[in-house]
Amino acid sequence: MVWRAAGYLAVPALLAAILLWWISASLGVGVGFHRLLTHRGFKTPKLVEYFLTVCGTLSLEGGPINWVVTHRIHHAHADGPGDPHTPRDGGWWAHIGWMLNGTAQKYDRSVMARYAPDLMKDKFHLWLNRVYWLPLVFLSLALLAFGGWSYVMWAVFFRVTFNFHATWLVNSATHMWGTRRFPTEDDS
């Protein structure tokens, strides 16, 4: 009730959060970081690649090169020694511990060059990897100017927090529970 009285439960702000979640998580991380950059599942003009990459940074899951390196290392060592977020080290570790205490997002240049040599040659990706938080700062300022604090709370803070847990559930829950459709050595 206090939130509603303060104007923080504004429906337009919630709709902005849902739209930005789709843009950042689905387009940015799912299509951009994951399918395009990590797996090179399709080709696109560089401007589209850069747009999707910037959208991915709005999820605040790290720079594009660090995200790709983490995911490629995960596939190289799926649910075994060397996997940054294996659930075999515990559900808490797979969900959030690896982000707080692990090596993810803390790669030196040699590891990045080994796992993402394609991206290390691209000046835009190198730059965005260093300042990945900057697009979200600009978006936050625009939302504040356009809609006030309710937009910032819903479309930035709550959206990013919700998306963190949605992403982490993929690393924890989907590798811990469910049925395995194909015979593999990992827990996915």
PLM-predicted stretches and their roles:
Residues 115-123, 177-188:
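Active-site-proximal inter-transmembrane loops
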Residues 1-168:
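Non-catalytic, topology-defining segments of multipass membrane proteins
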